[in-house]
């Protein structure tokens, strides 16, 4: 099991949909979150993409020297990036980071944003372009280890004599992650990517997605890993966790929700449509209405695009829900919480000890200093002495 955290390059806050409790984004703050994730033992961090965010490649590059082992899940954008350039970017980053790059293939689902970026393709065409893009990208990087070149002619993208002089550290290329809920997305995932990501839907729906992608991949003689993107609200007691879930959306105004849902409705993303359906397009507001599956809460999606659900509960309950997803075949959990700095610590301290040993192994590199405040100037506390 791998647990990732999230770098909030679109801003951070204690409340959703309001400036109250907001935290200004700065490089110092981004570094704090990254250093915390690195030192706490998270496998890596997802760095978001889109016009609401700082550029993910610039941000990720700036975090290489302040982290030691943290991996960076960074987006490539067909239509915004050309595959040859994206291959050079990936190879350079991978070498300079010591092999810590992971690629997030993002097709995009907001037509207004895409058109602003110069991409005028419909849903089907975007997935065709993405399939061509990642095929070219993979081939260029794979051939770079032997000095090879690539000729490729597609419907949307073509290259002639494409060559990468300096290969990536990881062979054949940094692993490719990809998310999407449409049939076209599942086809692309099955044929070309290393790990398929889903947003946090109820376990039964996630199981259907996994089964579909797995079956499609088998037809190509491939296997695919699976990951899930979730928010987390974990506290020492169940009541505290649900109170903080309510508090997170307590400053939301009706007009803010209406405006956000109208924007989501204009998108042609199947994943976003499925997220919106979980809270009935913003009409559900109470805990009973927003708890769409045991301890799975859809309140975040009232105003946040993309991942809109959170696991809510005490540490043991949240760990149990994570294990339920793991039993379905999920091995990568990309998590976040508001505010991201404090919640990175809280989740690691409360939930990591309850997860498989492979997660805790990343914490074993301590320097032998105090673990907790020394008791009576005599000894450091241990779990057995609590």
Swiss-Prot record:
Pfam families recorded: Bac_luciferase
The entry's keywords: Flavoprotein, FMN, Monooxygenase, Oxidoreductase
EC number(s) per entry: 1.14.14.5
InterPro entries hit by this protein: Alkanesulphonate_mOase_FMN-dep, Luciferase-like_dom, Luciferase-like_sf, SsuD_RutA_monooxygenase
Transmembrane segments: none
Swiss-Prot/TrEMBL GO biological process terms: alkanesulfonate catabolic process
Catalytic activity: an alkanesulfonate + FMNH2 + O2 = an aldehyde + FMN + sulfite + H2O + 2 H(+)
Electron transport found in the keyword field: no
GO molecular function: alkanesulfonate monooxygenase activity
Function, in words: Catalyzes the desulfonation of aliphatic sulfonates.
Family: Belongs to the SsuD family.
Entry protein name: Alkanesulfonate monooxygenase
The organism of origin for this protein: Delftia acidovorans (strain DSM 14801 / SPH-1)
């Amino acid at each position: 099991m791998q647990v990732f955290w999230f770098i909030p390059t679109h801003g951070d806050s204690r409340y959703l949909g309001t400036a109250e409790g907001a935290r200004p984004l700065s490089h110092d703050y981004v570094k704090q979150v990254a250093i915390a994730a690195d030192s706490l033992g998270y496998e890596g961090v997802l760095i978001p993409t889109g016009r609401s965010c700082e550029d993910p490649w610039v941000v990720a590059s700036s975090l290489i020297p302040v982290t030691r082992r943290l991996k960076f899940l960074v987006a490539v954008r067909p239509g915004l990036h050309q595959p040859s350039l994206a291959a050079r970017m990936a190879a350079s980053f991978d070498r300079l980071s010591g092999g810590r790059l992971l690629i997030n293939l993002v097709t995009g689902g907001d037509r207004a944003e895409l058109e602003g970026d110069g991409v005028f393709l419909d849903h089907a065409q975007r997935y065709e372009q993405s399939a061509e893009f990642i095929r070219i990208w993979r081939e260029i990087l794979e051939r770079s280890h032997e000095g090879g070149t690539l000729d490729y002619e597609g419907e949307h993208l073509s290259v002639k004599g494409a060559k990468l002089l300096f290969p990536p550290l990881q062979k054949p290329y940094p692993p490719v992650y990809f998310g999407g809920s449409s049939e076209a997305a599942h086809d692309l995932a099955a044929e070309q990517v290393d790990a398929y990501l889903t947003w946090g839907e109820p376990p039964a729906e996630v199981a259907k997605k996994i089964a579909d992608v797995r079956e499609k991949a088998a037809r190509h003689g491939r296997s695919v890993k699976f990951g899930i993107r979730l928010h987390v609200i974990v506290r020492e007691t169940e009541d505290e966790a649900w109170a903080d879930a309510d508090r997170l959306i307590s400053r939301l105004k009706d007009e803010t929700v209406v405006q956000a849902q109208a924007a989501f409705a204009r998108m042609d993303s199947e994943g976003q449509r499925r997220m919106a359906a979980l809270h009935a397009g913003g009409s559900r507001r109470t805990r009973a209405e927003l708890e769409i599956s045991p301890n799975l809460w859809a309140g975040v999606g009232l105003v946040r695009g993309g991942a809109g659900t959170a696991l809510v509960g005490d540490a043991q309950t949240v760990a149990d829900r994570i294990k339920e997803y793991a039993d379905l075949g999920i091995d990568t959990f990309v998590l976040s919480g508001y505010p991201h700095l404090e919640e990175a610590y809280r989740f690691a301290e409360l939930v990591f000890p309850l997860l498989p040993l492979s997660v805790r192994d990343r914490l074993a590199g301590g320097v032998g200093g105090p673990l907790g405040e020394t008791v009576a100037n005599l000894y450091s506390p241990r779990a057995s002495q609590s």
